[in-house]
Curated annotation (Swiss-Prot):
The keyword Nucleotide-binding does not apply. It comes from Onychomys leucogaster (Northern grasshopper mouse). It is found in: Mitochondrion membrane. Pfam families: Oxidored_q4 (PF00507). This is NADH-ubiquinone oxidoreductase chain 3. Belongs to the complex I subunit 3 family. Its main location: mitochondrion. It catalyses: a ubiquinone + NADH + 5 H(+)(in) = a ubiquinol + NAD(+) + 4 H(+)(out). One of its GO terms (molecular function) is NADH dehydrogenase (ubiquinone) activity.
Amino acid sequence: MNMLMVLTVNMMLSTCLILIAFWLPQLNLYTEKANPYECGFDPMSSARLPFSMKFFLVAITFLLFDLEIALLLPLSWAIQMPNINIMTLTSFILVSVLALGLAYEWLQKGLEWTE
């Protein structure tokens, strides 16, 4: 019963926050918000410059690898557990998947900035 209540409250809160995030920006629509702030001067160019696709892919790759490294942080705490073999195997599998992902990105030339 408690688990059902926790899930219900979490779903309601998530739905409420998502709806607020979609409705709130639509209240004050005017072009001044789309301009960059340049210390009171008129903007020299558009505020909505497109990102390079290479930059975007490198940034996403960095975030994925950073998240996978964060999964290894509890490893030092888990060494104190009585069944260390399972934790060692799990961490080895995680590092192997991380290394395979890095090798795949390297072979696909996803880490090269210049083409």
